[in-house]
């Protein structure tokens, strides 16, 4: 009640104060103020002495800093609670597999990476950060260190089968990898590139028979019409082929980008910069950068072969499309020709049907008394219509015939014989001159 009674006194004084002073007063009253029961006496102090103390810049700065610290602490707590958790599968040099869960913040702090380095990207890429190789292949993300290989968040059944059955043996040296005598990162990179090439090859091997079978059914000359269901299947397979061509192109571009720069090849040899023994071997005779270049060139050629195979399928689809269009045009031409023939027949019948129209006007004539006149007029009508229709069809056939290629004018036999005799005479003269010159030189 005392607070309510003191409001008329406080409001005029509060209206004179600036907005920042009022905010500071509100913060201070809510944080360190006394209970509400003692508001009457405190109200007068707020109007006079407390307002003067709180209006200072130091007091305002302290209140703003406290408010800022509170919001930053809350935001950090919420970010820590919302931080994503990765399911990490670790492979060491001996092929041992361990799985664990780790927060993203903890993981990139342990690996010495930045938060942007562990972002998921659906584009194929190979990058090096802080002596760590980061490989992204759509749903596969891997971090390669000189000691181990980390696979982050695999969510594919086929990938799981490859991870736990084939990859450990390849990393331990029991597989058919060419880079087994080289450091660990070579084996890891080769295993991942080999898996991705096999994946692209599998997609192509699935699409190729489907596309060829559909094209054979569409281009078959036995079928006069085009099956729309086959066209729909071909359209879907064409879209899948376009996606495969894009994946192969991105794979080739990512490898070619590394091959064009020697510094990136040197950075991919991470054991060279962390292990002094490997550095001595690389300095002595084994050039690890050159070995890495040969490895990437090999898989670039494999990707190029896949690209050529996909391009051949695309050319077959385009050629078959042109053949289908030609067949459709031929069927359309047949229908148009039939329409012209029927139109000509209708025209000829209507032309000689005028005779029947003349007799149907109910006019009296002497021809109606003879019973043979009906059959005579009817026969003349049909014969005349048939003759005119035949003439129109022959005219149409002459107009639609393809023009013959121009004939080459043949030379007469006499000129050919004369040319041959002249050639023989010239050859004999040259031989005679040559023999005479040789005799003179011998003498």
UniProtKB/Swiss-Prot annotation:
Which residues does the record give as Mg(2+) 2 binding sites?
A: 329
**Residue positions binding Mg(2+) 3:** 360, 362
How, per the record, is this protein's activity regulated?
May be regulated by calcium ions.
Question: Record's Pfam families?
Answer: MRS2-like (PF22099)
* Gene3D superfamilies reported in the protein's UniProt record: 2.40.128.330, Magnesium transport protein CorA, transmembrane region
Alphabetical list of InterPro entries matching this protein? MRS2-like
Record GO terms (molecular function): magnesium ion transmembrane transporter activity
The record's keywords, sorted A to Z, are:
Ion transport, Magnesium, Membrane, Metal-binding, Mitochondrion, Mitochondrion inner membrane, Transit peptide, Transmembrane, Transmembrane helix, Transport
Q: What is its main location?
A: mitochondrion
Where would you find the membrane-spanning parts of this chain?
Answer: 340-359, 371-401
Q: Which residues lie on this side of the membrane: Mitochondrial intermembrane?
A: 360-370
List locations, semicolon-separated.
Answer: Mitochondrion inner membrane
User: GO CC terms for this protein?
Assistant: mitochondrial inner membrane; mitochondrion
Annotated motif GMN motif, positions: 360-362
Record: transit peptide: 1-49
Q: Which intervals lie on the Mitochondrial matrix side per UniProt?
A: 50-339, 402-443
Q: Which domain of life is it from?
A: Eukaryota
* Positions annotated to bind Mg(2+) 1: 243, 246-247, 312
Membrane topology is:
Multi-pass membrane protein
Q: What does this protein do?
A: Magnesium transporter that mediates the influx of magnesium into the mitochondrial matrix and regulates magnesium metabolism. Also permeable to calcium, sodium and potassium ions. Required for normal expression of the mitochondrial respiratory complex I subunits. May play a role in maintaining the inner mitochondrial membrane potential.
Under the subunit heading, UniProt states: Homopentamer.
Which comment does the entry carry about domains? The GMN motif acts as an ion selectivity filter.
The family classification in the record reads:
Belongs to the CorA metal ion transporter (MIT) (TC 1.A.35) family.
Q: What else is noted?
A: Has the ability to complement a deletion of MRS2 in S.cerevisiae and partly restore mitochondrial magnesium concentrations.
Please report the name of this protein according to its UniProt entry.
Magnesium transporter MRS2 homolog, mitochondrial
The record lists the organism as Homo sapiens (Human)
